[in-house]
Amino acid sequence: MFSKATLKERRQYYREEWSTKDMPDFILKDLKKREFGFDHNGKGPNDRYKVFRGSESLKKFLRYKAPFAAYISVAFYNNPRRREDWQKAEYIFDVDAKDIPIRSCQCDGVCEVCLGQALEIVNSLIDTLQDDLGLNNIHLVYSGRGYHIRILDEEMMTSGSELRSEVLKYVAGAEVPKSNFFNPDISNKSFNFEHFSIPVGYSKIFTDKLKYNIQHLVGNEELDEINPKLMKDIIKYRHHLDNDNWGYFKRDIGPRRYKNLTEAMARVNLSTIDAKVSIDLKRILRLPSSLHSKVSMKCMEVKNRETFDPLQEAVPKFVEERGE
């Protein structure tokens, strides 16, 4: 499993297994407003600016060409063939299992463990998008070696790159929450509240992600501002976090080193998501239902994110016939 598909296998997939029924409704209903791109030789999507008026013409193309990869734009255009008259674009969070900076599996590519970790991460992101931001037109797609969160709420679809960047930083936990609060009503005093003492809002988002990262450290990760001694102590004292005893953990790590830790993990949080994809208004993504030929997996919409298992649901028939 996870080996490259041959041309013969690609042809078999698109002629025997691929179906328009596997394409999500949110893709099908506006097919003619999107740009398509194709990679025919594994060197990137050089065949761009394609347009299909309906699913049948797309079906014929895929069966005839059996592309190495198929892509579709997140943007909607009145003239997609020229990428002109942009209307709006999906808001995307792209999490690739092989690019997660803290991976407990330590594998070289993708495996069952890091794919499971990627699903945990996107589930957490979706919960924040729904609970904190009130977004609800959200679709999850398994890309073949990670996940795409595709958001179609109108307020995000029509937003620009600046707002998308700010939302990304909030949802990802990409900044350390401020701890000093000034209250002019109480003798102009300043109060200090650590992020872990505020169990709501952004402080909770950051604390939850910080805890998740710390608990998944193996010990050999190379992270800015975390030297080997600090890494060793983080792992030594992280048992405090099993019961959310953050005060004890910070005490044993030390205030200055704890600051280094939180700043490093804020950067880790942001690097877990491909930020370029999130702010790009004209990005093309893998077409749900297409084949990810590098790893021989289906790119598909996830119907139930709590129970989805890519090794059971996204494996093409030709992989099973290999006997892998």
Curated annotation (Swiss-Prot):
What Gene Ontology terms describe where this protein resides (cellular component)?
Answer: DNA-directed RNA polymerase complex; primosome complex
Q: Which UniProt keywords apply?
A: DNA replication, DNA-directed RNA polymerase, Magnesium, Manganese, Metal-binding, Nucleotidyltransferase, Primosome, Transcription, Transferase
Task: List GO molecular-function terms, semicolon-separated.
Answer: DNA-directed RNA polymerase activity; metal ion binding
Biological processes annotated in GO? DNA replication, synthesis of primer
Q: Which domain of life is it from?
A: Archaea
Broad enzyme group: transferase
Cofactor requirements of the protein: Mg(2+); Mn(2+)
What's the EC number here?
Answer: 2.7.7.-
Q: Which residues form the active site?
A: D94, D96, D274
Q: Which InterPro entries match?
A: DNA_primase_S (IPR002755), DNA_primase_ssu_euk/arc (IPR014052), DNA_primase_ssu_PriS (IPR023639)
Recorded hits in Pfam families, A to Z, give: DNA_primase_S
- NCBIfam families this protein is in? primase_sml
Q: What does this gene product do?
A: Catalytic subunit of DNA primase, an RNA polymerase that catalyzes the synthesis of short RNA molecules used as primers for DNA polymerase during DNA replication. The small subunit contains the primase catalytic core and has DNA synthesis activity on its own. Binding to the large subunit stabilizes and modulates the activity, increasing the rate of DNA synthesis while decreasing the length of the DNA fragments, and conferring RNA synthesis capability. The DNA polymerase activity may enable DNA primase to also catalyze primer extension after primer synthesis. May also play a role in DNA repair.
Which protein family is it in? Answer: Belongs to the eukaryotic-type primase small subunit family.
| Quaternary state and interactors | Heterodimer of a small subunit (PriS) and a large subunit (PriL).
Q: What is this protein called?
A: DNA primase small subunit PriS
Q: What is the lineage of its organism?
A: Archaea, Methanobacteriati, Methanobacteriota, Methanomada group, Methanobacteria
